[in-house]
């Protein structure tokens, strides 16, 4: 499971659309999204309610405590909303120690209300927890002792008996309505593969639940079965995290292929760089470097898997090598080309792309004093490793090559020994 945060606009869009599908009832949620590409005149034409009602506007940037930070404006007309957005769009703010520009806003009707309730559903390995409180809103943390929580093991149904502790203290006139709302939201949570869904607060409008503020996370590994349900979903980067051009390039490659190609720069001046086959293996290699005390020297996180084509590996390897060899400073560096034992990926075929990239970047590798460490196993691995050994002689770059007889992460220790001995 990969938990990915989505914008409030998308959370509300999914809840509104699928609440009706699953319950037959309409949630009167209305909201629009504004970013730098939005034509405000076209937006008002498409959503006439924007010009006839009082509005709420706030950043939609995956961070909380917007109200406490003075980033929520209430009871505005649309002209005031436009001014609010213009004054803040692209401006940098700091939230919980993270700095970044505000790029996206959500606008919705202002809903006068007295009651504020809290609802949260979150999944973990063993099941789902559902939390509810009659004291929701911006002071929820101060009133956490009033939050009630139940746990449902995986596969269990949310029956009235199980739900009863959550709504036990509600007035009778609203108890059934809120209980039914919680049950539908839980069904929707599972149906859409949410991993986290929080409404803080939701209120009652004409006796029916109405979510005012919402946060959501989806299991993005379930995208293959939910692409129609999710629609045009966006998984934004965490607030304060901006992709570099090289990361954006790899992200574009990843979106176009059935394989997996991941790349994140951790420290541009790092002296240990990785290019690892397999999602699990890539994390193990990175953790091993950290466990050995050299996390500060780890330049990147990189993972390729799912039998990428040779040309895809070539483009991917070019980017990794360019970053690993940038700005040579006379200090030695290490490139770890690792992986476990593949099940179906042709090791020699994927190595072909890496070898082509290494040949192209021969001069850069030498200028950066790069030492390469290789460890791999799987189909056709002997041929792939033989090509790697021959490559070292061809381009005059030191390459240490190991097969499955060596421990998977042993080359991490060798890489560290190399950069420290040559320092």
UniProtKB/Swiss-Prot annotation:
It is found in: Cytoplasm, Cytosol. The keyword Repressor does not apply. GO terms for biological process: lipid metabolic process. Disulfide bonds: none annotated. Expressed in trichomes, epidermal leaf cells, anther tapetal cells, stigma and in young vascular bundles of expanding leaves, cotyledons, roots, pedicel of flowers and siliques. Citrate binds at residues 343, 345, 376. The keyword Acetylation does not apply. Its EC number is 2.3.3.8. It comes from the Eukaryota. InterPro entries: Citrate-bd (IPR032263), Citrate_synth_N (IPR056749), Succinyl-CoA_synth-like (IPR016102). ATP citrate-lyase is the primary enzyme responsible for the synthesis of cytosolic acetyl-CoA, used for the elongation of fatty acids and biosynthesis of isoprenoids, flavonoids and malonated derivatives. May supply substrate to the cytosolic acetyl-CoA carboxylase, which generates the malonyl-CoA used for the synthesis of a multitude of compounds, including very long chain fatty acids and flavonoids. Required for normal growth and development and elongation of C18 fatty acids to C20 to C24 fatty acids in seeds. Heterooctamer of 4 alpha and 4 beta chains. Belongs to the succinate/malate CoA ligase beta subunit family. This is ATP-citrate synthase alpha chain protein 1. It comes from Arabidopsis thaliana (Mouse-ear cress). The lineage of its organism: Eukaryota, Viridiplantae, Streptophyta, Embryophyta, Tracheophyta. The gene is ACLA-1.
């Amino acid at each position: 499971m990969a938990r990915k945060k989505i914008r409030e606009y998308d959370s509300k869009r999914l809840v509104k659309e699928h609440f009706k599908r699953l319950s037959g009832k309409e949630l009167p949620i209305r909201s629009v999204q504004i970013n730098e590409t939005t034509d405000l005149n076209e937006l008002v034409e498409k959503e006439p309610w924007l010009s006839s009602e009082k509005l709420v506007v706030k950043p939609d940037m995956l961070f909380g405590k917007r109200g406490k930070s003075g980033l929520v404006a209430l009871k505005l007309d649309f002209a005031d909303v436009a001014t609010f957005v213009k004054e803040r769009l692209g401006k940098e703010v700091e939230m919980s120690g993270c700095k970044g520009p505000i790029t996206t806003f959500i606008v919705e009707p202002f809903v006068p209300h007295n009651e504020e309730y809290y609802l949260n559903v979150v999944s973990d390995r063993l099941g789902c927890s559902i939390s509810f409180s009659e004291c929701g809103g911006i002071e929820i943390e101060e009133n956490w002792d009033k939050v009630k929580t139940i746990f449902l093991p995986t596969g269990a149904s949310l029956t009235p008996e199980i739900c009863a502790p959550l709504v036990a203290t509600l007035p009778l006139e609203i108890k059934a309505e809120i209980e039914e709302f919680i049950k539908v939201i839980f069904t929707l949570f599972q149906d859409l593969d949410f991993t986290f869904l929080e409404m803080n607060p939701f209120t009652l409008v004409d006796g029916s639940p109405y979510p005012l503020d919402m946060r959501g996370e989806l299991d993005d590994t379930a995208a293959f079965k939910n692409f129609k349900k999710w629609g045009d979903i966006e998984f934004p980067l965490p607030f304060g995290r901006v992709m570099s051009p090289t990361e954006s390039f790899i992200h574009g490659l990843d979106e176009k292929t059935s394989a997996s190609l991941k790349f994140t720069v951790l420290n541009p001046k790092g002296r240990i760089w990785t290019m690892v086959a397999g999602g699990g293996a890539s994390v193990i290699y990175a953790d091993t470097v950290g466990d050995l005390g050299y996390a500060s020297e780890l330049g990147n996180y990189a993972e390729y898997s799912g039998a990428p084509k040779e040309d895809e590996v070539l483009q991917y390897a070019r980017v990794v090598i360019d970053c690993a060899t940038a700005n040579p400073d006379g200090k030695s560096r290490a490139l770890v080309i690792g992986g476990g034992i593949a099940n179906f990926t042709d090791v020699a075929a994927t190595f072909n792309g890496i070898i082509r990239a290494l040949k192209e970047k021969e001069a850069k590798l030498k200028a950066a004093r790069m030492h390469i460490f290789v460890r791999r196993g799987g189909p056709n691995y002997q041929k792939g490793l033989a090509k790697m050994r021959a490559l070292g002689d061809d381009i005059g770059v030191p390459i240490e090559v190991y097969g499955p007889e060596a421990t998977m992460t042993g080359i991490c220790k060798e890489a560290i020994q190399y950069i420290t001995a040559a320092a």
